Amino acid sequence: MLELFSTCPQSRDLPADQYRQRVADVAAWSDRAGYRGILVYTDNQIVDPWLVAQVVIESTEQLCPLVAVQPVYMHPYTVANMVSSFAHIYGRRIFLNMVAGGFRNDLLALGDQTEHAERYARVVEYALLVKRLLLGERVSFTGRYYSVENLTLTPPLPPDLFPGIFVSGSSDSGVAAARAIGATAVKYPKPPHEEISTSADGAGIGMRVGIIARDDDSRAWKVARARFPEDRKGQISHALAMKVSDSQWHRQLSQLGAEPPSAENPYWLGPFENYKTFCPYLVGSYTTVAIELARYIELGFETFILDIPPDEEELQHAAVAFEQASRRAPA
């Protein structure tokens, strides 16, 4: 069964007096569109994701905040306590998006010098400790990164509100971490013909992708290029970000931009290369985009986290493409 998530606006992209209302609006659009949840980012330059998650909860009926969790920011107990507190106060479910952290300078600023592979090992230990607490265990544990003694979680979490857990990462280490946790691995996808089947990975699989779909290819590309024009300043920022990132997905996507997009190749990295977003886009007619989505679904992708929507109509356009893709993909 496919699960769709949108993405919440970032505080650095809007004036402070407009940000809260914009979060509420995007969340409400996503809720009305029937999405499972909405991704809430975390990093050193934006507001706290748990406070944003509260705005999402208070602005919607069913939408689940998918909160990005970076181990360097808070103890595993604090994350478990936040999940159970939302359940206790609002009766609502939270999803967790575990991130290892791809921008090394952000980690160094916080005094964290953990290497790339070790950061995924830390994510595994962190997430398994969170899970044990949320399952109601009394936990005594001494690991490589964390140690607790007779720790329990109060208030306890109702079993039906146990969080969905994702691990963000396109590397083998990221997929292995998701498998160890029993989580969904979220990738930044290559074009479908370059992806391999995920059915044997032992972990659920999802992707971050943007979609611009319209009645025909030319109209979709007109919208896409107007929304994401070439930006020399953005290209320079992208190049600088590459130098301070040890993320495999960042390098992979940067190497994929040589083939020009077209009706035959709707996979587009223009927004990524101009530093407007971090995910690839699928651009074209509903049918063109649906064919690409169906190929991903056939490869085992079941969770799709779409980019920040500019308006409610964009979610409706994406829904048409997904509806067609679901009919094309084998049951």
Name each model feature, range by range:
Residues D31-R32, A53-Q62, V83-I94, R179-A180, ...:
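Acidic (Asp/Glu)-rich catalytic clusters
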Residues L2-P9, I38-V40, C64-V69, I94-M98, ...:
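Hydrophobic faces of well-ordered beta-strands that scaffold small-molecule active sites
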